[in-house]
Each structure stands twice: as C-alpha cells, then as structure tokens.
C-alpha cells in the first residue's frame, strides 16, 4: 500500500526493539482506504460496561458465590453428619456411645458401650492405623484411641484406651455378652461356678483382685486373670496398668469394666496423677479355639518345668478333712499305716493345719508331735514323701512376731510406721511383705531349714489372697495393683515346685507347681459343690494354669456345709463315690476322708479308679504336661476345643476332654445311674467297647453304674 494514504482513524504505532517511542515520533499517514495496518501485539480494547449494567453484574456474581457456598456447606454438613454417626477401622465401627466388631463374615461378634460419657467424634482424627479422639461429647478433654493391629492373617486386634485428663473420675465401659447363642468363658474362680459364664442379678464394680470366696458370695476367687473369651471367636484382655474393677448386669447381659482410683486399694504409679485409664485389647479370629491359642501365646507365660510324675500318677493324702486342727503324731502315723494296709499308693502325705505351737512358727508343737524326727523317719521307711502346710500369716502370739516387727518384714499400715494386723480364719496376725527381699529370704530360709531337718519334700502354700490384706496398706515396694502381692507369694513355691501346691494365681502361669482350687463343700450343687468342679477346672485351664489340683475328694466335710451320711461323719456315700470318679481324671487327685470309712465296695471302687488312673490317665497327663512348656495348651479342655463351630459343645459343663483324645462324662447328680452324653464329630470308642462313628450325636440316658464313669477314646 502507498505510504501517502490518509489515516482518518487512530492507529497504534509499531515500536521497534530498542527504540524509544515518544509523542513526537508518531507519524500518521493520509487516508486512502478503509483498511488499516495493525501492530502484531494488537488486542481490541474491551468496552467498559455502562453504569447501568454494573449493579446487575455484581448481583449475578454474588448470587453465584452464594449458591457455591450453599453447596459447599451442604456437602460439609452431610459429611459431618456421617462422621458424627460412625467411624470405621477395619472390622470395627465406632460411634459416639461405643463400638462393635464384626468378623470376616460380617457377623457382629463384640459390642461395647461407653458408660462414663460419649465421644465427640468431631475431635477424632486418623493417623495410619491409629484413630484418636481428644474430647468427650460434653466438651471435657480426654485421651482416647483405637489402634488396629493385624498380627496374623486370621486375627484382627484392636488396642483401645480411654484416659481421663482430670483425676477423680471413673472410666466405665459395658461389654455385652450378646444373645443366647453367644457364650463367654474366663475371668476368675468363683464361689458359684458356671461354664459358660452365667450372670446373676446386678453387681456394682468391685476391685478385680484375688479373694477368698468364703468371705463373700460375689467375691472373685484366688485364681484370676483379666481375660475373657467368647464362643464367637472374640477375646478381650484388660491391660495390667488398669486399676480394674468388674461388675455385671444380668438384665442387659453386660459386664461392667471400670477403672478408678477412689474408694479402692488400687494406687496410681509413683509420679502419676490419679486420672484413671481403661485400656484393653480385643481380638477376633476365625474360631474360638484358634483365637484362644493366640491370646495365650501372646499374653500368658508358660511353665518352664513339669511337677513330679508321681503327682500325676498317684493320689495325694491330706490330714485336713479327716483330722482338721486336731492332727497329731499318732494320727499321722496311723493314717499312713491305714493307707498301706488298704494297698493304696501315694504321691505324698500332707500334714495340714495345725502342727506348730502358733501360727507363724516354723517348728513342731512338741505336745502334739513329741518326736517329729522319728515320725518323719518312720514315714520315710514306709515309702511316704511328706509335705507341710504353710501360710503368709504370723499371729501376734507367735515367737516370730517380734522378730518380724523389728526387721520390718510385714505389710504395714498406710503411714508405714506400724505393721498392719489382719483377721484371718485362724486368728489375728501380721502378713509377710513378699515385696521385701528380706521377708522373702526369711520365709524361704525357714522352709529350707524344715526341709533339711526333717527331709520334707515340699509345701502346701495356703491363702495368699488380697482379701486378707487391709484395704489401705503399704509395702516395701509400692503396689499399684494389689494382686501383685499374691503373685510374689506364689513365687515362694518355685524352689519346691516338684510337689508344691498354691491356691492363688495372678500372672503366675510360669510357676511350675500345682494350683489348687479353693476348698469345696460336701454338697452336689454349683455353690462350691460337685457340679462346680468341672466348670472351675475348665475356667482355670483357660486362664493358663494347666497343673490343677481340685482339692479333696468329697469336699471338706464341714458339718454345716455337708450333704451328710446316715451312718457316720463326712459326705454321703454316693456323693463321695461320684467325686472320686471325677477326680481320677483330673491332673491330680487328693484324698483326705479315706474310702475305708465307708465300706468294702467303696474301697474297691477307689482301687479300680486308682488303677485306671495309673494305666490310662496318667500316661496321657504326663505326655500333655511335657508339651505345655512349648504350646501352653491346657491339659483339661472343653468339648469345643476339638469342635469350635459346634454350638452344642459351647454350653456343655458336665463333660471334658483330656487332650484331644479322651472324653470324660461323669455322673454328677444324686440317684442317677444314667446320663446324657454328647459326642462331637469324629469316631469315638466307649469304655465298654462300643464304636460311635455317626457323630455328632447325643446319647440319651446312657447307662452308667455307680462304679463307672462314661469315658470315650478317639478312634479316628
């Protein structure tokens, strides 16, 4: 185009790189056409909105922002609602008031409610496998977390902890036992013992510590662990650090798990406030047997040794139910003579309460035992090993009391200045402080001297329950958990393990001696009677104690608690025989009331089952005992051990297994010479030679004579 064309419209000049374009450099060409050359970087100017359009545009933008805000708010609100209703961690569903756990099939197997407050789920956050919350629904601060742990493919575990930030509060969670098809086991030896657990009435949470069940109907027994197991393959273990209290409510079928430091013998660890924590681990597996095996291997110690073989093979003979405190030298020698005259073997002969001048002495009462050394020599010549009864008390009239006070060997009152005196079943005295190294050495030193002087084989360690300590006390080493005192007492038996027996157990599974059930009454029922024997043995077995002594055949024969005989003192004849038959299949059996106090038939029945024990039962017991140091599996097992999915097996409390191959079904009711017997799946051969291979099967009214126990061996 010609450069002299006239420009009638404004054109934008082209700036050359490096040039400075000012107003004077602008050149306008004359207009010659309707086209104009535009610069390379030209962009048309945006027309400015008129003043009338601006309010409309602002309104539109504002409306759009409001719509977006509403959408975002609704999404946030919906998410918040979903969050407030439930949080999930693998198979666990957490809500404000508790949580539930499902198994791999989606079935609910565990449910728990928070009873000391609800969670504010808006305060919860997740960090990997850890889900933590910092606030309760009422706004108070707390520390709560659930951590998911998968220790193996078939097991899922959840670590749960609720800790109050302020001292003085109690933390309580309610664990529901579920519907009638769910069954729970474990916990503690009880006065009225059922298998599975049966809740009765309502019980406010009380300290879960070792106790003498004779002191209270609702007391927990001398052997207990913070462990429960469900037939639906769920298990719970409460942590050792918890100031643990347990109650129950039978109406809602719940167990009340509580942690508190007020109105209790629990004390916070040194340097910590009295703000309690409730912490535990819940694990879910594929079946009840496998999850129990996992929990035992994870949380319980195992015995490192096995007691003497004669304790599994031959009966123990005790002076207690026969002679009580009236025992003396002549009675001991006569008892030993009668045992041999009636051709019975013996694991050992036990001289029980009371052979000393006072409780707390460690020498024989010369009035009752004028020549104890000669008595021991004669017993030894007759082939008897001898054990002695001992306990942790030193009565105020004992020759040892002054020494114990001077050397500060006793549990003391809270200020620590004076020994704490307690009342026990044999008077008033002090209690040895087994947290004190000097007290431990003093006690064991006396036992060693007794063993050396008289060739005593071992000892029966009686008592040891926390219920015999004052509620407020102090020890050489402070105890935040009072049951640790019981554990320290059981440790006194370890040097004498081969034939020793103790009656308390708390975290004591590594003590390689027999754990004795609390004394039984000479009655038929579940209240410390014959029917309670199998449930108690199964419970203690599930708590990790395989070497169990079910106390004396026929019970203690205390007159006011005895189903009496018409022809003399002691338990009635039928009860005695049925008790003897059960005991013959237990890890240990113990006589005190002897069979010859009845008649020749009872003596013959006793001989029959002593021989059966030696030939059939004892070899199996010893084989299983040898495996325990590796596996931790119980010797006496419930039927569901080999049939974990069998709902009938879950609730049977009158049969048991020895290992996996010997099933025992004794008669436990008066006047019966038949019983129903349940055989789980498999091939079973009866003691009569019958083969049962169409199983599982219920044998109704299976005949069992007075001199028989129905037992079956695995034939597959």
Swiss-Prot record:
Which intervals of the chain are annotated as region Disordered? Answer: 1-26
Q: What is the documented disruption phenotype for this protein? A: Knockout mice develop bilateral calcifications in the thalamus, due to the formation of calcium phosphate deposits.
Tissue specificity remark? Expressed in brain, liver, spleen, skeletal muscle, heart, lung and kidney. High expression is observed in the cerebellum, specifically in astrocytes. Highly expressed in skeletal muscle (at protein level).
Hey, what's the signal peptide range on this chain? Answer: none
One GO biological process term: positive regulation of phosphatidylinositol 3-kinase/protein kinase B signal transduction
Q: How does it sit in the membrane?
A: Single-pass type II membrane protein
Q: Cytoplasmic face: residue ranges? A: 1-55
- UniProt entry keywords in alphabetical sequence: Endoplasmic reticulum, Glycoprotein, Glycosidase, Hydrolase, Membrane, Nucleus, Signal-anchor, Transmembrane, Transmembrane helix
> Where do transmembrane segments lie in this chain?
56-76
GO cellular component labels: endoplasmic reticulum membrane; nuclear membrane
Where on this protein are sugars attached?
239, 249, 455
Induction summary: Up-regulated during C2C12 myogenic differentiation.
Compartment(s) of residence = Nucleus membrane; Endoplasmic reticulum membrane
* Record: active site: 462, 465, 527 (proton donor)
Query: What EC number(s) has UniProt assigned to this enzyme?
Result: 3.2.1.-
- Is Protein biosynthesis tagged as a keyword? no
User: In UniProt terms, what function does this protein have?
Assistant: Putative glycosidase. Promotes myogenesis by activating AKT signaling through the maturation and secretion of IGF2.
**How does this chain assemble?**
Interacts with IGF2; this interaction is required for IGF2 secretion.
Return the similarity comment.
Answer: Belongs to the glycosyl hydrolase 31 family.
Which protein are we looking at?
Myogenesis-regulating glycosidase
Which species expresses this protein natively? Mus musculus (Mouse)
Designated gene of the protein: Myorg
